Amino acid sequence: MALYLSGDPEADAFLSQDPLALLIGMVLDQQVPLERAFSSPRDLRDRLGGQLDAGAIAAMDPGELAEVFSQRPALHRFPASNAGRVQQLCQIIVSDYGGDAASVWEGASSGTDLLRRVRALPGFGEQKAKIFVALLGKQLGVRPSGWQEVSKPFGDKGTHYSVADITSKESLLRVRAHKAEIKAAAKAKASTA
């Protein structure tokens, strides 16, 4: 199944085919529009000479990688800190998973193990890890025992909470509407407190 996260067919195809690209996109999915976050792995690949390789990124000079992230258009609103986060991610992929990003989920023995593995990666807090587990389960068929339970509420069927639920322009709009409702409710609650 082809992912629909960046709104760019080429970038989405790359995310669908390259597990490292998908992990990097998820790391970058904060404080920027999701389309930018998920098109950035393709742009990073292009800036690195046409290959996205965990070992090569892990071994890069941190300043050089930050420069690559900072080239216009920048790959993120905060290019230097996110270059560091992506480099740390790649270092863990190399040291713990033999350089194979898909091994993060392919080797998971259960949903709990999968969540633990994702949660241990740089840039993945509890909520983002649950969203990524839900994305793997809902869209990529990675469903170790208990994956829906550990990714609640994002793994629930019929929801429009996160990138795990985006499969089309229509579902993207539903996710955005849901996020706007939550933000408005939080703002209303804060103003009455």
Predicted regions span which residues?
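Short Gly/aromatic-enriched secondary-structure transition segments
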Residues: 38-44
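Short alpha-helix boundary/capping elements
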Residues: 31-36, 48-49, 94-97, 140-141
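Structural motif
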Residues: 11-21, 32-34, 76-81
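Alpha-helical ds-nucleic-acid-binding substructure associated with the helix-hairpin-helix region
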Residues: 48-119
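Short, aromatic/basic-rich helix-turn unit that serves as a nucleic-acid recognition element
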Residues: 23-27
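C-terminal accessory module of base-excision DNA glycosylases/AP lyases that mediates lesion recognition
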Residues: 1-13, 17, 111-116, 126-193
